[in-house]
């Protein structure tokens, strides 16, 4: 376990893991700007401004850029977040077109899909995250006059706690196929909690349920050296964050293999292929190459509950 993480630690959108959610929202805001915008997320920028972290505000205002950095220059960051966002957007769109009317966004952070996607009538979208993060986003978007485009139900709980019970108490229907997303989440969970997350998802899923997540197969992706390099880049942005304090390390099960063993039919989508599909050139920076073998994963539950 990272020395900076403790059992039961909590955060809002300006601290610890929560600040990384704001970082992602800032990237979506940048990708949504200008006549050649890659994304359409009009709520990302106001959420970032409401959090109030100066480096992220400067990023969305175009006042902080590192054109010499192949990972953190505005264009590279916009393309990276576009690949990721479009993958999960398309996942939910495809799931609802297949008839699924129940969705769960795990570690929802500042995700705005419950507000910006066109959900079919009768769709219920559950968002699960830390209480402070849920409250902040709900209040901020209400003050902006934004309204969900589906029935949005929030579950304020840490994913290391008994979130399945909280989800059921919130009205989740275990008899209905569900579209699940675990976006940008797994490194923030201990290895055993990652397995438990997928066990719980499987136990809660009716046949035909779908799941989207990511996997980095390189066991050295979060080595001390690489985490130090990530931290250096964050500090260059003016962020007082240490990657080694946020990520849990240790040997993990391969996501695709683990889900297959639980009865899911898994389809991996290598990041390089998704870059090409979106018309982008994959960055050849060493840090980006580390994640070049990363796969976005979608899966469908073929049998009964595990």
Swiss-Prot record:
<dbReference type="GO" id="GO:0008168">
    <property type="term" value="F:methyltransferase activity"/>
</dbReference>
<keyword id="KW-0489">Methyltransferase</keyword>
<dbReference type="InterPro" id="IPR007213">
    <property type="entry name" value="Ppm1/Ppm2/Tcmp"/>
</dbReference>
<dbReference type="GO" id="GO:0032259">
    <property type="term" value="P:methylation"/>
</dbReference>
<feature type="binding site">
    <location>
        <position position="129"/>
    </location>
    <ligand>
        <name>S-adenosyl-L-methionine</name>
    </ligand>
</feature>
<dbReference type="InterPro" id="IPR029063">
    <property type="entry name" value="SAM-dependent_MTases_sf"/>
</dbReference>
<dbReference type="Pfam" id="PF04072">
    <property type="entry name" value="LCM"/>
</dbReference>
<keyword id="KW-0808">Transferase</keyword>
<feature type="binding site">
    <location>
        <begin position="158"/>
        <end position="159"/>
    </location>
    <ligand>
        <name>S-adenosyl-L-methionine</name>
    </ligand>
</feature>
<protein>
    <recommendedName>
        <fullName>Putative S-adenosyl-L-methionine-dependent methyltransferase MAP_4190c</fullName>
        <ecNumber>2.1.1.-</ecNumber>
    </recommendedName>
</protein>
<keyword id="KW-0949">S-adenosyl-L-methionine</keyword>
<comment type="similarity">
    <text>Belongs to the UPF0677 family.</text>
</comment>
<dbReference type="InterPro" id="IPR011610">
    <property type="entry name" value="SAM_mthyl_Trfase_ML2640-like"/>
</dbReference>
<comment type="function">
    <text>Exhibits S-adenosyl-L-methionine-dependent methyltransferase activity.</text>
</comment>
